[in-house]
Amino acid sequence: MPQLDTSTWLTMILSMFLVLFIIFQLKISKHNFYHNPELMTTKTPKQNTPWETKWTKIYLPLSLPL
């Protein structure tokens, strides 16, 4: 059974990483990014709920006299 020659693997792996890095750099360089991003304030509409318009009194069990 012949021996597997792995002497060129390091060169192939390093060249692959280099090519991938260059490809990603070229892809990223073509993107248009905003120069001055600003936060947009989103306003949620206030919804009136029935319990907000009525006055209710809540009695806690611990606050009752003994």
From Swiss-Prot:
The name this protein goes by in its record: ATP synthase F(0) complex subunit 8
Gene Ontology cellular-component terms listed: mitochondrial membrane; proton-transporting ATP synthase complex
Positions bearing N6-succinyllysine: K54
A GO term for molecular function: proton transmembrane transporter activity
N6-acetyllysine, modified sites: K54, K57
GO BP: proton motive force-driven ATP synthesis
TM segment ranges: 8-24
PANTHER family: ATP SYNTHASE PROTEIN 8
Family: Belongs to the ATPase protein 8 family.
Binding partners and assembly: Component of the ATP synthase complex composed at least of ATP5F1A/subunit alpha, ATP5F1B/subunit beta, ATP5MC1/subunit c (homooctomer), MT-ATP6/subunit a, MT-ATP8/subunit 8, ATP5ME/subunit e, ATP5MF/subunit f, ATP5MG/subunit g, ATP5MK/subunit k, ATP5MJ/subunit j, ATP5F1C/subunit gamma, ATP5F1D/subunit delta, ATP5F1E/subunit epsilon, ATP5PF/subunit F6, ATP5PB/subunit b, ATP5PD/subunit d, ATP5PO/subunit OSCP.
UniProt cross-references to InterPro entries, sorted A to Z: ATP8_mammal, ATP8_metazoa
Physiological role: Subunit 8, of the mitochondrial membrane ATP synthase complex (F(1)F(0) ATP synthase or Complex V) that produces ATP from ADP in the presence of a proton gradient across the membrane which is generated by electron transport complexes of the respiratory chain. ATP synthase complex consist of a soluble F(1) head domain - the catalytic core - and a membrane F(1) domain - the membrane proton channel. These two domains are linked by a central stalk rotating inside the F(1) region and a stationary peripheral stalk.
Major location category of this protein: mitochondrion
Topology in the lipid bilayer: Single-pass membrane protein
Residues in the signal sequence: none
Keywords noted in UniProt: Acetylation, ATP synthesis, CF(0), Hydrogen ion transport, Ion transport, Membrane, Mitochondrion, Transmembrane, Transmembrane helix, Transport
Species in which this protein is naturally found: Ovis aries
